């Protein structure tokens, strides 16, 4: 079985939201706490960084170029240079207590972004969707920390995780992609790690980065663990599929909340890893505006 390898000579603070661009042969990701979007062009190893004025929770590439970016206080459209062009909406949570976190697009090119509640043990976060006409809509509440967004290949299910509560949910979707009542897909026990960012493969299996769990796990459509890949760091944060055949897994990791001793012992924490796998991942749509 292949093992994860470091992709490039870079160590971040809280890398998340890895996003593959097949057209560019490039990997994008955010460093949330640094307020950055990174781009790494695999053929040339060129690494560039866009800096923003506040934390960047998640983003998606736009069909017409540039990004849709969920920052702490709101969601913006930018050009390809990261210049803010239009504010889509404010953060519907209290931005002093909850920042935007994980997100992405569905097959219809709509953008989703969830928040992460900061202080205390309180489910004050939510998940919202930006439709193609830029209308914002809150679609789920009662969340402590949103993560793990992915969609089944048949578009009948939306998957999310609530990281602090250690649970992955799945939510049925109707023909228009509107959500029904969510249900528990998998609950994690103490010591297993907690579900962070995720991706979906073409067989309908859900790949989850298990924060504090030292591993990436693949789950069947019924929630059974099928495979796991051990990581050389404690806290993987998210995965995405890419490469020419979509059989390369890119993995972000973090060194947030690690003391100096742990960082010295596991110096690759915060790195970006690459892992060849035997199944192709689902391709992600760009954000489509109409």
Each model region followed by its residue ranges:
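Blade-level signature of beta-propeller repeat domains, shared across WD40, Kelch, NHL, RCC1
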Residues: 240-290
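Short loop/turn segments immediately following beta-strands, especially the blade-tip
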Residues: 171-178, 277-282
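Flexible "stalk/tail and boundary" regions
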Residues: 42, 63-65, 80-81, 90, ...
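Conserved beta-strand positions in repeat-built beta-propeller and related beta-rich domains
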Residues: 22, 27-32, 68-73, 111-121, ...
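A short beta-strand motif characteristic of beta-propeller blades
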Residues: 3-9, 45-51, 86-93, 135-141, ...
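A short loop-to-beta-strand structural motif that recurs across blades of beta-propeller domains
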Residues: 36-38, 74-76, 125-128, 167-169, ...
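Beta-rich, blade/repeat-based domains predominating
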Residues: 10-24, 53-71, 94-110, 139-157, ...
